[in-house]
Amino acid sequence: MLHRHGSKQKNFENIAGKVVHDLAGLQLLSNDVQKSAVQSGHQGSNNMRDTSSQGMANKYSVPKKGLPADLSYQLIHNELTLDGNPHLNLASFVNTFTTDQARKLIDENLTKNLADNDEYPQLIELTQRCISMLAQLWHANPDEEPIGCATTGSSEAIMLGGLAMKKRWEHRMKNAGKDASKPNIIMSSACQVALEKFTRYFEVECRLVPVSHRSHHMLDPESLWDYVDENTIGCFVILGTTYTGHLENVEKVADVLSQIEAKHPDWSNTDIPIHADGASGGFIIPFGFEKEHMKAYGMERWGFNHPRVVSMNTSGHKFGLTTPGLGWVLWRDESLLADELRFKLKYLGGVEETFGLNFSRPGFQVVHQYFNFVSLGHSGYRTQFQNSLFVARAFSFELLNSSKLPGCFEIVSSIHESIENDSAPKSVKDYWEHPQAYKPGVPLVAFKLSKKFHEEYPEVPQAILSSLLRGRGWIIPNYPLPKATDGSDEKEVLRVVFRSEMKLDLAQLLIVDIESILTKLIHSYEKVCHHIELASEQTPERKSSFIYEMLLALASPQDDIPTPDEIEKKNKLKETTTRNYRGTC
C-alpha cells in the first residue's frame, strides 16, 4: 500500500498535547505521559507543533527525546486494539492461528536473515526440504529436477513465474528470427491483482478473458481461441479464484491450447506453457482431495503431472498455515529457468544462486512452514482442510435452507454442489459422510441476496448487510463479481473464507447474526413503506419520532423490529388494557 506525507501529516496538531499544556494541573493522561507533557511545557516552547520540545511526539515526526520502552509499548498496544479481530476477519485468506510451539520457534529465529546462507546454513537446509516436499505434493516427475525458492508471498512468486515464461518466449522468437517486442499473457478476469501487476511492471500485454455465470465466474477454456496467438508467453490458470473459490481446469485449458497450436503449424512459439497459480489451491488440492476425487471432477492432472504446467506457486501464509510473509514458487525442471535470471552471489561469505525480487528478509516463516510439515504431516493437513470444507458446505446448506428467511440467499461458490448433478444434499450429514461426492475447491462461500429477495425489497442494498455485520465483529467483504460477458459482473457477492480456526460453532453464530440483521432490515423496510403511505397524515413530531425509532432499532441488540401490523396490534392492546384510576380533585 502506498502512503503519502501530505498536508494532514505536515500540519498535524497534537490536540492532547495542547490540552495537557493548558491544563497542566489536571490528571488527563496516564502518569508517565502526563509527566512528560508537563515537563515539555516548562521548557518554554509556545509552538505546539514543535516536536523537538515535546515529550509527547507528533505522530508523524520522530521526537527528539523518546518515551520509556514500557510506556511506548502500552501506547502502541492500546492504539492497535482499534484493529479488527483477526479471527473474525472472514475476508482474508491469510492464516491467523499459530501454536505455542511454533511461536517459540519463531521467537528463537526472529532475527535470522534468509539471504545469509553462509551464516545460517541450517535455515537454508530447511528451505531445501520444503522445496522438495512441495515438489512431491505437486506431482513432480521423478526424471526431472524441480527447482524453486521461497518468496515473500504469491505476489512475488507470480512475478518470477511470469518472468521465466517471458524469457523462454523471447529465446524462441529470437532463435526463429522473429519480433520479440510484443509479448502477451492470458488470464481470466477472476485473477488476483498480482497477476495484472506482473503484466504492467514487466511490459507484457495483459489479455483478460471475461468470465460468465455459465463458466462459474472462472476461465472458460473455449474462450482462449479469441486470445491466444504466437506472442502468447503463457497462460495463468488459477487453482482457487479469490472471488468464488473455483478451480480453473488445467487439463481443459491445455487441450484447447493444443488444438489452437495444431491450427497454426507456422508458429515458432508452440507448447505454450501454463503457470498454475495455487496461492490457495497449492495446499488445499494435494491435502484436501484424493486423486480419485480430482479425477471424478475432471482435474486429475493439475500440477507437474501435466506436461504444460512449467511452474507453480502457493502461499505458505494462507493454507500453508504459517505467519504472513511466505510464498513458494517451483519450476518443474531446472532447464525452464533461464540462466540470465539467476544470480550467483559471493556477498555474505559463501556462493549463493538466487532468483528473486528482494534480498534480505526474515527466515522465521520458513522455519514455521517446515514445523507445520513435520508436526501436522499429511494427515494433519488433510484433517484441517476436510473440517474447513465441511463447515463451509454446512454454512452454504444453512443459508439455502434457512427456516427464518426461506429463499433469501443464493450461493455463487460451488463446493456445496454434487459433482454428479450440481445439486445440494437433502441432509447436511451427507457432506461429512460422503465428501468425495462434492465439488473440490477452496473452503469459502460466496453468496448473495436472491432475486426473490430483491423483488420484494428492491431498496435494501446488500452492502448494508456487510456493514451491520461489522458491528457484530464480523469482517465480511461485499464486492462485484469479475468482468463478465453476460452482465453478471454487475452483481455483488458476500464472501466468507473458512480458515482452520473458523469452527462450526462460529459458523452457526454467523448464521444467526446474518438472519437477525436481515430480519431487522426487512422489518425496517416494511415500516418505512408503511410510514410513506401515511406520510400525509403524519405530524412533524411523529415523523421525527419515526426516524429516531428506526435508527435506534437498527442499533438495538434485539433481534427483531416489530412490523407495522405488530405495532398496531400492540397499540390497540394498550388502549384496551389501560385504565385511568385518577380520581376527582
UniProtKB/Swiss-Prot annotation:
GO BP terms: cellular response to oxidative stress; glutamate catabolic process
Against Pfam families, the record matches this protein to:
Pyridoxal_deC
Ranges of Polar residues composition bias in the record: 35-56
Q: What class of enzyme is it?
A: lyase
Q: Report a single Gene Ontology molecular function.
A: glutamate decarboxylase activity
User: Any idea of its EC number?
Assistant: 4.1.1.15
- Family named by the database record: Belongs to the group II decarboxylase family.
Which Gene Ontology cellular component annotation is one that this UniProt entry carries? cytoplasm
| Coiled-coil stretches | none
Q: Which reaction does it catalyse?
A: L-glutamate + H(+) = 4-aminobutanoate + CO2
User: This protein is called what?
Assistant: Glutamate decarboxylase
Q: Where are the N6-(pyridoxal phosphate)lysine modifications?
A: K318
**Keyword line:** Decarboxylase, Lyase, Pyridoxal phosphate
Which segments carry the region annotation Disordered? 35-60
Additional facts recorded: Present with 1200 molecules/cell in log phase SD medium.
Superkingdom, according to UniProt?
Eukaryota
Look up the record and name the cofactor or cofactors this protein needs: pyridoxal 5'-phosphate
